[in-house]
Amino acid sequence: QDVLKISYVGYTAKEVKVGNRKVLAIDLSEDAQALEEVVVTAYGTGQKKASMVGSVQAIRPAELKVPSTNLSNSFAGRLSGVVAVQRTGRPGADGSDFWIRGISTLSEATSPLIIIDGVQVSSADLNALDPEVIDGFSILKDATATAMYGTRGANGVMIVTTKSGQNLDKPIINFRVEGQISQPTKTPKFVDGATYMELFNEAVKNDGSPDVLYSQDKINGTRMKLNPYVFPDVNWYDEMFNDVAFNEKVNFNIRGGGKKIDYFSSISVNHESGMLKNRSKDFFSYNNNIDVMRYAFQNNINAYLSKSSKLSVRLNVQLRDLREPNRGIDDIFADAMNSSPVEAPVFYEPDGTTNHVKWGTTDRLITAYQGNPVAQLTTGYNDTFESTVIAALEFEQKLDFLTKGLRFKALGTFKNWSK
């Protein structure tokens, strides 16, 4: 039988079998769990969603634990009104650009304001945050919710709080290991060298181009595979790219404490690799593939000085080591896609007994995309090391003796970034 599913925000979804009925009377019950859900407000405090006036949306941390190397890719498509666009798959730079309810300002600053534990951070800092350390994740969308931040919150606000310790008899230890495989959804297909030359000659004749035509001897020699040095036939894409790439991620965290002090500590190691074949190992001692190692440390400590006083220390350290080829990845891909397959072999053997006559000569001009892309790929590498330290010291004093619920909070923050 056909089943009709009815759902609405704040109500429990219900499925009803239609059968032969033409009129259905359906009652939805309120979703108490959704209405009781606590969201983090602009003041950094928790408030039940049912009592909220402004437009605020929270996402459960468990929903962010998906196979992704960046947090922005994890919440993409999971938050209404948030548009996320991933512009590249390059390791180390594959985070998404995101906007809350579109672009609301005319200035260059179109990204939302991001607050982690009371500290304003960049989208790169957000991407480096491990989902295992997140305790609350809220999006403030409209002017009512973001009023506290003034013009800084014109593009919306993302507020993230990290986990704290708990008064436990025994500490809680978590260990998580992830393995990921990256693979292109579609790869280009190329014709063989002889077909390439025949199509090239036909295009030159039709276009009236002054380019030199390939000789029939070269076409025949390439088709018969007589000599790979004189008649090369190279699929540069296959020579430069692997079919898959493997990424690994490990997180270890511990949570515990007592009545006076509680703590939460986490360490994450994330390894990403690109899809370039390591051709430099045939000639040099380095790896020409893109390789990213990221380390993240999160330490939160709360000290309860009295029944009404609390001192909190939060420290986040991010380290990143990026190694990549000298030549930009966009240029490398363009070389593989556009270079002629018949102008040069991948490499020449170091044999001078024939004075390299066996390699032949070219009767064509060597122009753009008619060189050796593998040679361009192995011209060297860049190694970039970045470190970010974010620290926060917070003191909170309850003033219930003046007015119940009144609190005084002082927050000092520090951030240092080096490259």
Residue spans of the language-model regions?
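Transmembrane beta-barrel strand/turn architecture of Gram-negative outer membrane proteins
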Residues: 133-135, 153-184, 260-271, 275-350, ...
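Short, small/polar-rich motifs associated with maturation and membrane association
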Residues: 1-297, 311
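Acidic/polar loop-and-plug regions of large Gram-negative outer-membrane beta-barrel proteins
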Residues: 209-212, 216-232, 318, 323-390
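Catalytic cores of large soluble enzymes that bind and process phosphate-bearing ligands
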Residues: 63, 67, 88, 242, ...
